[in-house]
């Protein structure tokens, strides 16, 4: 079954912030990082349930899963939920950030 993937406005803003941060330091790396991230997001079109539940999944009424992207010091957690045949990317957080609290996440309606 193929899933549609939608990136929420909050996740889009977080991706943009990370891209700009990397671009200010190394434009080539930023472009490579962004292309890799988009390719990783695209993998959620097939078998998104292969990804583990997020550490914080019990805080939320819906199942929240995570997909890790990157290596070394550039690992990001893509937090998402699945509704029917749509995968919603909720947040994109650096792996070094503290775990989520319930008030950090608004699920799309």
Regions found by a protein language model. Give the residues of each.
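Generic hydrophobic/packing signal
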Residues: 14, 23-25, 29, 49-52, ...
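A generic structural signal for ordered secondary structure
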Residues: 19, 30-34, 48, 82-87
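Basic/aromatic recognition patch in beta-strand/loop cores that engages polyanionic ligands
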Residues: 46-86
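Residue-level recognition of specific faces of alpha-helices
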Residues: 14, 40-43, 66, 88
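Short, hydrophobic secondary-structure boundary micro-motifs
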Residues: 31-32, 52-56, 100-101
């Amino acid at each position: 079954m193929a899933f549609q993937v939608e990136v929420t406005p909050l996740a889009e803003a977080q991706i943009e912030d990370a891209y700009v941060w990397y671009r200010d330091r190394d434009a080539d790396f930023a472009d490579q990082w962004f292309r890799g991230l988009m390719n990783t997001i695209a993998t959620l079109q097939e078998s998104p349930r292969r990804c583990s539940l997020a550490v914080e999944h019990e805080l939320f009424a819906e199942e929240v899963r995570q997909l890790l992207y990157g290596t070394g010091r550039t690992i990001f957690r893509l937090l998402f939920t699945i509704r029917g045949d749509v995968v919603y990317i909720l947040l994109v957080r650096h792996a070094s950030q503290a775990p989520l609290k319930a008030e950090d996440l608004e699920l799309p309606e």
